[in-house]
């Protein structure tokens, strides 16, 4: 539905505008009439979900009141607005009907003394967010206009009555802006303050106007995202399509993490509406591998995952002469140099270290796992660790069989199995996770380390998954805001954006981002014959020290839960490291 609410801008006028007002009124009436003839229900839905407390059937009366307000404001002298109450409801323009009534009543008070310093009327601007008024369809409504009162002497006040506030494009105007972040229900909103100072030819300041784009747009953006997801769940794609277009405009008005998160979720929603699934092929896997390296360099989440898992493995290998690690998430092998160095420094000398890496095939059919193994072999030679390596290419961990791993007797070789952000990808394949856990039982490891996202993105209801993922990734993006701008940071955001796109836009086996919480994984592991192995207090202390490198540790938080370690941002856990072993009944 078309709307005639526009961005507030300062305007000075003491001339009548009855003829133009009449023309505007007719246009408004015709526009409202057209809207009432068709699409009224859709307009009411859009108004409701975006927080506007007015019906399309009331727009004719709203248009008349707008005309009255415009006429009254254009006829009020410069001192005619000083009586406006500071607590009047026009601070909430979403309630259009009551807002207009209160504005009209405020503009018709007893006359004030001539000496009072007032301000000139504020009239709607014909454009918002760069869209012409004729195309304006529930676009973002900015915040309030707040006036500062400059010192004006009596000799200059009479001259000011005939002046209009100049636009910011004037060479005599100066614009400054600042922004601060605020958190709204787990999503970051932004308050943008713009100060415009207009000067005369002599350089004198005549008026200062501060336009404040408050948290209202951020709240409206979140409501639009949720409403769009709900419309998709109800298969109301017409409404969802209209809402996703609104989200784009609302996101532009934000800054920082809020804008980035909303943009990625808007893209994912659009892909789901128009059935444009993101690619799921070998090239995409290779790209994700590269993006994960940037994510590793940018923030502590992967470093925390590797460090805590390595600490658990190191303790489990204590006193063993031959050790074997089977890595379900080999990728670039970033986890293992630190473990190899720790083994090299072990009292009594390093053990013989065997590493089996499992990863997806490369798009060019190159043996990238072999290349990773060669680099690790060079490191092992430099630190005097006897090293053996073998790589396995598999499209899925569910294709793995224990007989492929060349297992040796447990009394001669201790085995550890490691998985970082891999097991959740099996949940979309029927029987996939059960098969892999069965292979783990056949391996009989002394320890099975698992790192997964601490969130439930695998429920049967799309709206619930969307809500949880919106909060989760908003927190993740917020934690990245303290990182200096760099290519690593940009690529890290793309890495997370790809996860959002898969989680929201895909279904069935194509949806691989099926994260679950620690309690859910605990139930799965318990039913497969695995028992928790508590991580030691030493791992907790050293993980806390690791975080001090990132943003001086501010914002990040490590906490222990049932023998597992969680890393979060402020009060929200984001990833969890857990360790498991075969239960007594499994032997």
Curated annotation (Swiss-Prot):
Main location: nucleus
Positions occupied by motif VHIID: 323-327
Motif (LEXLE motif): 66-70
Protein localization: Nucleus
InterPro entries named among the record's database cross-references: DELLA_N_sf, TF_DELLA_N, TF_GRAS
Keywords: Developmental protein, Gibberellin signaling pathway, Nucleus, Phosphoprotein, Repressor, Transcription, Transcription regulation, Ubl conjugation
Tissue localization of expression: Ubiquitously expressed. Expressed in roots, rosette leaves, bolting and mature stems, young and mature siliques, flower buds and influorescences.
Pfam families linked: DELLA, GRAS
Residue intervals of the GRAS domain: 212-581
Domain of life, per lineage: Eukaryota
Annotated region described as SAW, given as residue ranges: 505-581
Positions of the UniProt region annotated as Leucine repeat II (LRII): 371-403
Stretch list, region VHIID: 292-357
Motif LXXLL motif per record, residues: 423-427
GO biological process, one term: meiotic cytokinesis
Listed GO CC annotations: nucleus
Placement of sequence motif DELLA motif: 44-48
Cross-referenced PROSITE patterns: GRAS
Keyword RNA-binding part of the UniProt annotation: no
Span list, region PFYRE: 415-502
Description of the deletion phenotype: Rga, gai, rgl1, rgl2 and rgl3 pentuple mutant displays constitutive GA responses even in the absence of GA treatment.
PTM text: Phosphorylated. Phosphorylation may increase the interaction with GID2. Gibberellin (GA) induces dephosphorylation of RGA by TOPP4 and subsequent degradation by the proteasomal pathway.
Family listed: Belongs to the GRAS family. DELLA subfamily.
Protein task: Probable transcriptional regulator that acts as a repressor of the gibberellin (GA) signaling pathway. Probably acts by participating in large multiprotein complexes that repress transcription of GA-inducible genes. Positively regulates XERICO expression in seeds. Upon GA application, it is degraded by the proteasome, allowing the GA signaling pathway. Compared to other DELLA proteins, it is the most sensitive to GA application. No effect of the BOI proteins on its stability.
Domain description: The DELLA motif is required for its GA-induced degradation but not for the interaction with GID2.
Protein known as: DELLA protein RGA
UniProt organism field: Arabidopsis thaliana (Mouse-ear cress)
Lineage of source species: Eukaryota, Viridiplantae, Streptophyta, Embryophyta, Tracheophyta
């Amino acid at each position: 539905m078309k709307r005639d609410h526009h961005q507030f801008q300062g305007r000075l006028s003491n001339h009548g505008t009855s003829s133009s007002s009449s023309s505007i009124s007719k246009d408004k009436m015709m526009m409202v009439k057209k809207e009432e003839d068709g699409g009224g229900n859709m307009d009411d839905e859009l108004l409701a979900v975006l927080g506007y407390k007015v019906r399309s059937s009331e727009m004719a009366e709203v248009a008349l009141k707008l005309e009255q307000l415009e006429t009254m404001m254009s006829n009020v002298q410069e001192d005619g607005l000083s009586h406006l109450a500071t607590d009047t409801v026009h601070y909430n323009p979403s309630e259009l009907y009551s807002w207009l009534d209160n504005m009209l009543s405020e503009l018709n008070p007893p006359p004030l003394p001539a000496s009072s310093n007032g301000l000139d009327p504020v009239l709607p601007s014909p454009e918002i967010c760069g869209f012409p008024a004729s195309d304006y369809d529930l676009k973002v409504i900015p915040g309030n206009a707040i006036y500062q009162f400059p010192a004006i002497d009596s000799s200059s006040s009479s001259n000011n009555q005939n002046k209009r506030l100049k636009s910011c494009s004037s060479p005599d105007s100066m614009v400054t802006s600042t922004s601060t972040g605020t958190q709204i229900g787990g999503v970051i909103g932004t308050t943008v303050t713009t100060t415009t100072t207009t000067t005369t030819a002599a350089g004198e300041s005549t008026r200062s106007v501060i336009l404040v784009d408050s948290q209202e747009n951020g709240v409206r953006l979140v409501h639009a995202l949720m409403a769009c997801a709900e419309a998709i769940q109800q298969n109301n794609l017409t409404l969802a399509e209209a809402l996703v277009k609104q989200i784009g405009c609302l996101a532009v008005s934000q800054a920082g993490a809020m804008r980035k998160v909303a943009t990625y979720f808007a893209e994912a929603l659009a892909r789901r509406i128009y059935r444009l699934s993101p690619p799921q092929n070998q090239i995409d896997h290779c790209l994700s591998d590269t993006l994960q390296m940037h994510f590793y360099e940018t923030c502590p989440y992967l470093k925390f995952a590797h460090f805590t898992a390595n600490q658990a493995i190191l303790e489990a290998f204590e006193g063993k002469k031959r050790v074997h690690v089977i890595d379900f998430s080999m990728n670039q092998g970033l986890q293992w140099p630190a473990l190899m160095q720790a083994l090299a420094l072990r009292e009594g000398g390093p053990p013989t270290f065997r590493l089996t890496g499992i990863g997806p095939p490369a798009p060019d059919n190159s043996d990238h796992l072999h290349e990773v193994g060669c680099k690790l072999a060079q490191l092992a030679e430099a630190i005097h660790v006897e090293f053996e390596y073998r790589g396995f290419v598999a499209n899925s961990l569910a294709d793995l069989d224990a007989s492929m791993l060349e297992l040796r007797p447990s009394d001669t070789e201790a085995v550890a199995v490691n998985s970082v952000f891999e097991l959740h990808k099996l949940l979309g394949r029927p029987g996939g996770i059960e098969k892999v856990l069965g292979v783990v039982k056949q391996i009989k490891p002394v320890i099975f380390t698992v790192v997964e996202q601490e969130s439930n993105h695998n429920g049967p209801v799309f709206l619930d998954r969307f809500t949880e993922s919106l909060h989760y990734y908003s927190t993740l993006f917020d934690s990245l805001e303290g990182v200096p701008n760099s290519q690593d940071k940009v690529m890290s955001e793309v890495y997370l954006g790809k996860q959002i796109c898969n989680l929201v836009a895909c279904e069935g086996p194509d949806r691989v981002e099926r994260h679950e919480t620690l309690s859910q994984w605990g139930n799965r592991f318990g039913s497969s014959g695995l028992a928790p192995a508590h991580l030691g207090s030493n791992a907790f202390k050293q993980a806390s020290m690791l975080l001090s490198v990132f943003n001086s540790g501010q914002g990040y938080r490590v906490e222990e839960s049932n023998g597992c370690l969680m890393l979060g941002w402020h009060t929200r856990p984001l990833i969890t490291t857990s360790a498991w072993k075969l239960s007594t009944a499994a032997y």
